[in-house]
Each structure stands twice: as C-alpha cells, then as structure tokens.
C-alpha cells in the first residue's frame, strides 16, 4: 500500500539476456499525452472499446478518459466522483460500467482518515455515477482486484479496517502534542506482521447479482499494496506489504477455472542489481506484453527485511523510502531483471491494451505525483520503454 498519507512518512548481478531494454521514440509504441493533473494513489481501468478511465487519488474527485482508438488522443474530463476524495480504490469494468471499490479518505475536513467499504459505478453512456446498494465484507484499502469476466471481479488483500482507522483516530487525538503523537506512531509500527491482520480472504463480487462470495484464502500472509494481473486464466498477485514498511518478494499464482481458484507454486522476484536480497515492492506497475509479464517501479525500504529478521518489528525505522526504477519480466517461467524505467516511480495506474502496458501517473522519488504516461512493450526480443 506504501502508506502515502502524511502521517505515514515515519512509517543480481545484471544478467546477459536475449532480451534487452531500450528507450524508443519510434512508432513501435503508442504515445499518450500527460494526464490533465498529476495523479498518484488513484485508480483506473479500461473498457472493452479501448477507452481508459483514471481518477481519484491526488486528482480528488476528478476522473478523465482517453480513447486509444482515436487518431488524435486527448484526455477528456467526465462527471466528478460523488463519493468524496479518496485514495487506493480499485476499479474495473463490469457489464460495460466502471465499478469503484473502497479506498481511504475523510468524510469531512475535520474527520480522521478512514477505510471505505462502499461501491460506486459509472455509466459511460449516461455520464452518471450511482452508489451501488452493497458494502464489501471487509473494509477496502490497500486491496487489489482483477476482472474475472464481464460480471465478476476478484478482490483480496488490504489493511485491517479497525486497526487502520484506530491509528488515525489516535493520531488526530494527539493533535499538537508531538510527544504523544510519536508514541502513537511507535506503538503502531512496532508490532509483528501477524498483529496487523491484513486481509487474506479472497472475495468475488458479482455485479449482475450484486452479491459477494468467499472464494477461500491466500496461500500465505495477507498483503497490502500488491500488484495483480490476470492472463490466460492465471492470477498473479505480486509482492506488497506484510505490515507497514515491510514488503514481501513473494508472488502468489493461481488458476481460475470453472469458477474455482486453485493456488499454484509461489515465485519470487530476483534481487536488484548490486543488492543482496529483494526487499519486495509495494505500488508496482504490471501487465502483459506478448506473453511476458512485466513488473516495474514501486517502492520499498532497503534493509527493513533484515531488521525484521533480526527481531526489530519497527523494521523501517530510520530508513529512507526508496522508489524503484527496475523492470522485471517473467520469461519461460523464470523472473529476470530487464532494465530500468525512465525514472523511479510507483503508486500509479497500470492499464494493458493489446501488447502495451501503460503506466499512468505515479509518485516520483520526491514523493510528488506526476502526470506523465509511459509504456512497456515487448517487441522482437526487446523491452521498449516509451
């Protein structure tokens, strides 16, 4: 999840491959204009007609769309979101409507941050939003979701609503008492991962029936801020946080068949060049291009994993957060280091169209939102970054 809120700031040797990385300005990849306003911790999805929708996060209640099939591609503003400004929502298209699940925000300027469990949907035909008459079985912040078919979405992971909300209530209560606030922060972070009770239940929401189903549990610990991808009926749940500040390098893999999820053998990202171990990523970009699953960017706290192994529960205390620019590819069943992005970036929106993976917005190494749109494309054995 990355813990981007203001009070959370206290929170391989390079292989010679037949694949290479290149920065290209050729016609191999689609060039998209910048988003009208910088976007981090937002959400987005693409419909069946090649139209991308992004919004929320640092864009507040604003949403934008861009039609990839048009010769002249420009972002257009759509009707603002009625549910209030929020971050870390998940969105997918179901039955030709854009569904938005959960997030974290404030009910008003005086209230503390809190986890949402509501669902909204947007009609592109009518340009209208509607609150869906449902609530999720658990609060949804730091969760991830993938579309299973035209009526169902799989949602899993995320923070524990009660523990998360209590932290911000306590922070607000401490107010200007810096000593008390530091005590709240330390007590919150100085716990083992199991004490945060991150969600490990897998839920399936059916938009046609407006129902939720328990589809089992993750094969390991619950995570927050994971990246997820669905391809050829295989779900990949990539890294994420085990607790605030501590990532995992594990990638869960499952097969979706006959409305059943079957978990397969886990894999792990390799260490970055020059580093002894892979800390794991939160807020990474991901998507498929010509059959290769690409994962790039995100952020972590180098050294937090070793601290935690040594018994230091506040594992990222005193460690500067590092935004990443490495790109990894899953090639013939093995993860490989592929190269670097144009800049370190995380917590943006990943959208796949054809064999291009668009990286929309994100947070740079200064913690600032960006409005740029870049892309990954595998072409003739090369990873093209545009």
UniProtKB/Swiss-Prot annotation:
EC number(s) per entry: 5.1.3.24
Broad enzyme group: isomerase
Keywords noted in UniProt: Carbohydrate metabolism, Isomerase, Kelch repeat, Periplasm, Repeat, Signal
Active site: 241
Reaction(s) catalysed (UniProt annotation): N-acetyl-alpha-neuraminate = N-acetyl-beta-neuraminate
Localization, UniProt: Periplasm
Primary localization class, coarse: periplasm
Keyword Repeat: yes
Keyword Transcription included in the entry's annotation: no
GO annotations of cellular component type: periplasmic space
First and last residue of the signal peptide: 1-29
NCBIfam families from the UniProt entry: muta_rot_YjhT, PRK14131.1
Function: Converts alpha-N-acetylneuranimic acid (Neu5Ac) to the beta-anomer, accelerating the equilibrium between the alpha- and beta-anomers. Probably facilitates sialidase-negative bacteria to compete successfully for limited amounts of extracellular Neu5Ac, which is likely taken up in the beta-anomer. In addition, the rapid removal of sialic acid from solution might be advantageous to the bacterium to damp down host responses.
Record PANTHER family: ACYL-COA-BINDING DOMAIN-CONTAINING PROTEIN 5 (PTHR46093), FIBRONECTIN TYPE-III DOMAIN-CONTAINING PROTEIN (PTHR46093:SF18)
Family: Belongs to the NanM family.
Record note on quaternary structure: Homodimer.
UniProt name for this protein: N-acetylneuraminate epimerase
Gene name linked to the record: nanM
């Amino acid at each position: 999840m990355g813990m981007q809120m203001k009070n959370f700031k206290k929170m391989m040797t390079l292989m010679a491959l037949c694949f290479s990385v290149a920065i290209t300005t050729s016609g191999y990849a689609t060039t998209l204009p910048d988003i009208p306003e910088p976007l981090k911790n937002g959400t987005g999805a693409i419909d069946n007609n090649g139209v991308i929708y992004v919004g929320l996060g640092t864009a507040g209640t604003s949403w934008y769309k861009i039609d990839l099939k048009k010769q002249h591609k420009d972002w257009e503003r759509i009707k603002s979101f009625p549910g209030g400004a929020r971050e870390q929502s998940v969105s997918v298209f179901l039955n030709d409507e854009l569904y938005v699940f959960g997030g974290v925000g404030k009910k008003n300027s005086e209230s503390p941050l809190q986890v949402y469990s509501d669902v909204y949907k947007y009609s592109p035909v009518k340009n209208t939003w509607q609150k869906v008459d449902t609530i999720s079985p658990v609060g949804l912040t730091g969760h991830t979701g993938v579309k299973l078919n035209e009526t169902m979405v799989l949602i899993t992971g995320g923070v524990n609503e009660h523990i998360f909300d209590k932290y911000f209530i306590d922070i607000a209560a401490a107010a200007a008492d810096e000593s008390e606030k530091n005590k709240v922060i330390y007590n919150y972070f100085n716990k083992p991962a199991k004490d945060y009770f991150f969600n490990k239940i897998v839920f399936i929401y059916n938009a046609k029936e407006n129902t939720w189903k328990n589809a089992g549990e993750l094969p390991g610990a619950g995570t927050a801020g994971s990246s997820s991808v669905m391809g050829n009926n295989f779900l990949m749940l990539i890294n994420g946080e085990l607790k605030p500040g501590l990532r995992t390098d594990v990638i869960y893999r499952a097969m979706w068949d006959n409305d059943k999820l079957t978990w397969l053998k886990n894999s792990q990202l390799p260490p970055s060049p020059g580093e002894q171990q892979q800390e794991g990523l939160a807020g990474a970009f991901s998507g498929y291009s010509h059959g290769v699953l690409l994962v790039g960017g995100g952020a972590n706290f180098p050294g937090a994993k070793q601290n935690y192994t040594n018994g230091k529960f506040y594992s990222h205390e005193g460690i500067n957060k590092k935004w990443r620019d490495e790109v990894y590819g899953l090639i013939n069943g093995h993860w490989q280091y592929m190269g670097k992005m144009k800049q370190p970036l995380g917590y943006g929106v990943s959208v796949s169209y054809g064999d291009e993976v668009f990286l929309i917005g994100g947070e740079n190494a200064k913690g600032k939102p960006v409005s740029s749109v870049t892309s990954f494309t595998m072409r003739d054995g090369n990873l093209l970054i545009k």
